[in-house]
């Protein structure tokens, strides 16, 4: 990643944040990939650029539902030209918001940790679901299944809606739930017209200086969502997805114990992953 003259204030699994002033920061998406909450050694070339383009597309498309973190500035407004040229496709100028300490997950279909919970209890995050659902079943309605936000390296934990209310307050919990479901419904309906099923996704929200709920971070990318192709979707199977699933599947069968460091991922698996990210961008935005 290019070194920037701005002061780095945070380095996450994928994104780095730089201070511009007390109201704004620069968010840069790297090519880092995390799987099972471990950051892998090998980057995925151009991944940060593709993710930024997908996110920007959705932020604009969903702006009528709620405010987002954009300030209206470009990277050229806040960086010297030679630095801006290096990061222009993977960086955005965003508001400094007070993040809400909950992962806002919406599920439209049953898979992953949700399916595990359902098999054991018939519920997800305490929500009762109909009997007889299987892998990849479409849920009667999209559901909001929050998880607690853990520090980088810790696994996030699914929590009930009541626990979400306890952590962030009743009023805010309802606002977050309703916003997340509205965003998911609109995005899922659009994606379906492009041949993509959005199985589930994670939104991040923050509060601005006036306390207004604001959409932030990344939106509906293959990193924060499971995208399935309409063509390969079959209920009862685990459909292939447009994301790091290639890498996750390879790691699963490599015998790795999911503790850092992760094993080196083969070049062909990395290339297939890049191709999947690019395909998602092309399908959604063309």
Curated annotation (Swiss-Prot):
Domain of life: Bacteria
Gene3D superfamilies assigned: ATP-grasp fold, B domain, Phosphorylase Kinase, domain 1
Disulfide bonds, paired cysteine numbers: none
Keywords per UniProt: ATP-binding, Ligase, Nucleotide-binding, Purine biosynthesis
GO cellular component, one term: cytoplasm
Enzyme class, UniProt record, top EC level: ligase
Record has Plastid as a keyword: no
Molecular function terms, GO-annotated: ATP binding; phosphoribosylaminoimidazolesuccinocarboxamide synthase activity
Catalysed conversion reaction: 5-amino-1-(5-phospho-D-ribosyl)imidazole-4-carboxylate + L-aspartate + ATP = (2S)-2-[5-amino-1-(5-phospho-beta-D-ribosyl)imidazole-4-carboxamido]succinate + ADP + phosphate + 2 H(+)
Known EC number: 6.3.2.6
Keyword set includes Ligase: yes
Metabolic or biological pathway, per its Swiss-Prot or TrEMBL entry: Purine metabolism; IMP biosynthesis via de novo pathway; 5-amino-1-(5-phospho-D-ribosyl)imidazole-4-carboxamide from 5-amino-1-(5-phospho-D-ribosyl)imidazole-4-carboxylate: step 1/2
BP GO annotations: 'de novo' IMP biosynthetic process
PROSITE patterns from the UniProt entry: SAICAR_SYNTHETASE_1, SAICAR_SYNTHETASE_2
InterPro entries associated with the record: SAICAR_synt/ADE2_N, SAICAR_synth, SAICAR_synthetase_CS
Protein family per UniProt: Belongs to the SAICAR synthetase family.
Name of protein: Phosphoribosylaminoimidazole-succinocarboxamide synthase
